[in-house]
Amino acid sequence: NVYWLTYEPSPDPGLRMPRRDAPPDPVLAVSPFYSTTVRLEEDEYYRSQLPWTEASDHWLWDRTIYPSSRPTLTFAVELSSLSTLVPYEALFSASIVGYFTYGDHCVQFSLNGSPSSLDSYIWSDDSRKDEQLVHIPFDSSILRDGMNELRIDGCLSDTTLDFIYYDWFELDIRRNYEADNDTLAFKVAEEGWQYQLDGFATKAVEI
């Protein structure tokens, strides 16, 4: 049920919305999943010169130094209620910035121990230190319901030292309509669908 609560400083009563039942419609199809973006971001390092532009976000999460002291990073990614109805093309995105190198920057991304799951990203920015927005599509079958591991490795290029900072990571995925801790947030992209929501502790649900 939806209610419209208003306040009007006059003697007339405010507008009221009637109560209306909305039982399942046997004609409308049930939406099988919804699309969402899972974002991973923490502010651990402040670098005023990274990225190069003043208006950029200068708080960064972590770094790799290849091949010497810190060539690899791993991040735990917990995903729930993944839609496995049909395979689809998921999307991995990252915001990264090169800090120091003698040549090209190179980084390899992988998910759940599969070196071919994502891809390497190579770029050269000389001394500008611009933000790089990485977008890599991948097969959804690589994802696991539960804990996933994102691994980042520095990789061989034409340099002897490669220093890279990482700001955030995103996964564009599909999920089932199942509540997490009695909460479920999703966007309705178009009309003509009905939605079956599961996983709530009680039948009384606020929308």
Predicted regions located by residue number:
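Structured catalytic cores of large enzymes
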Residues: N1-E206
